[in-house]
Amino acid sequence: MSCYICGRGHHAQRLPFLCPIDARNRLYEGRLAQAHTLIDSDRLKQQTNALIEQPPPTAAKASRSSPAARKAAIDDWASKHQEAIDRTAEIIAQADRLKAEVEAARQEIRQRKKTLARRKSDLAEAADGIEEKRKKQLDKVKDNIAATRADWDLVHESTASNRAFLCMEAARLYGLRRLKKGSSVKYELGGAEVVDLHALTGASPQAITISFSHIVHILNRACQYLAIRLPAEIILPHADYPRPAILSITSSYSYNHDDIPYPGTSDQQSELNTLPQDDLFYQRLPRARPLFIDRPLPVLAKEDPAMYSLFIEGVALLAHDVAWACCSQGVPVGPEDVLHVGRNLYNLLIGNQLLRGVSSNDGGNSTPQMGRYSHGAVHSYLGSAEGSDLVRTFRLPNPIKLADRLKSKLSSDAPNPDWELLEDDAWT
């Protein structure tokens, strides 16, 4: 080993020691030789002591030749022999027990294998039977479902036919007719002519009010029969509400009719001022659109522009409701035909069913489209995914845009007076 002081490796002959480490390394050989000598001396000492402790051979022979020693040796051998026999017998018995246990275990294993094989065969047979039985039960359930669905479809078709029949009979009892004179076509309801929305400017207030009153009554009755809910809620006359009105689409079906203020012919704010202003409920009440007027439309537009706008909005909402009801019952209505309320109402309640009756007599599809979709049955429910897809195909114009279009049409058709009317005090 090298010295950690001088850093030189030790060599006994060539490099003398210069420090304690080198001296210690020089002494290692002597120490190792002394250790080997001590080990050899100890081994020789042990061998000598073992030889000294052994008895002489003559004494051993003498001890074995004495009778007592021979008897003791024989007894010792006999006891050892008996012990060996007993131990052998015990080992043989233990072996027999182990053989019996092994044989019993093998027998149990064979029995279990037989049982498992039998169970597997039984399970295979049962599985084949269960699969067949399950298939039969599944087919039976499918047949029952198909039969139930077919019965359900038949009941729904019958219900739709009854709905259509009730609507047609109600329209006929109410006097809904189509009158054709030359090239002009007019519609009559309740003995009064259904006003043309494009000619409201020239119609009298009584004719407009009566016509809209009849329309909302027959439309509400038809919606009850068809179990549909119109987008814009109609308020029929009731206590303290002598004339019909209509709500906007966003305000419909959210409030009780008794809580909604009556839209009088003057500004509605006078009635709203009588309500408790500290109650948030009354502040949020919707404003109903009137479906009646008490003066000619040009006069109303000049004297009460706010009431005129509300009335036009109500007319547009009513036309939108009629068109929506037609589309939901399979009666096509184009975007330009929404304002033809009389024609749409007649086609919904009478004309469309007459056309379907003719097509069924010619061998066409006899399933009535009217009455199929509704809000009152799970079958063909208008609130389902299928019904929502149907509603998205209507493509009806927005009531606000419809009101603007009607307002512009009426303003363009309004007659311009040739003379300016002056009050009496203007001559003084």
Swiss-Prot record:
Keywords, in A-Z order: Autophagy, Coiled coil, Membrane, Protein transport, Transport, Vacuole
Domain notes: The coiled-Coil domain is essential for autophagy.
Name of the featured protein: Autophagy-related protein 14
Family: Belongs to the ATG14 family.
Annotated S-S bridges: none
Entry keyword Lipoprotein: no
Coiled coil (UniProt feature): 82-143
GO process terms (BP): autophagy; protein transport; SNARE complex assembly
Pfam families in the record: ATG14
InterPro entries referenced in this protein's UniProt entry, alphabetically: UV_resistance/autophagy_Atg14
Membrane topology: Peripheral membrane protein
Phenotype of the disrupted gene, per the record: Leads to the formation of sparse hyphae with necrotic centrality, and a reduced number of condia. Fails to penetrate both hosts in infection assays with the two susceptible hosts rice and barley. Also leads to delayed mobilization, reduced lipid bodies and lower turgor pressure of the appressoria. Impairs the delivery of ATG8 to the vacuoles upon nitrogen starvation.
Organism listed in the record: Pyricularia oryzae (strain 70-15 / ATCC MYA-4617 / FGSC 8958) (Rice blast fungus)
GO terms for cellular component: endosome; lytic vacuole; phagophore assembly site membrane; protein-containing complex; vacuolar membrane
Membrane spanning stretches: none
Function statement: Required for cytoplasm to vacuole transport (Cvt) and autophagy as a part of the autophagy-specific VPS34 PI3-kinase complex I. This complex is essential to recruit the ATG8-phosphatidylinositol conjugate and the ATG12-ATG5 conjugate to the pre-autophagosomal structure. ATG14 mediates the specific binding of the VPS34 PI3-kinase complex I to the preautophagosomal structure (PAS). Plays a crucial role in hyphal development, conidiogenesis and pathogenicity. Also required for glycogen mobilization, quantity of lipid bodies, and the turgor pressure of appressoria.
Record text on subunit structure and interactions: Component of the autophagy-specific VPS34 PI3-kinase complex I.
Induction: Expression is hihghly increased in nitrogen starved hyphae, as well as in invasive hyphae.
Compartments, record wording: Preautophagosomal structure membrane; Vacuole membrane
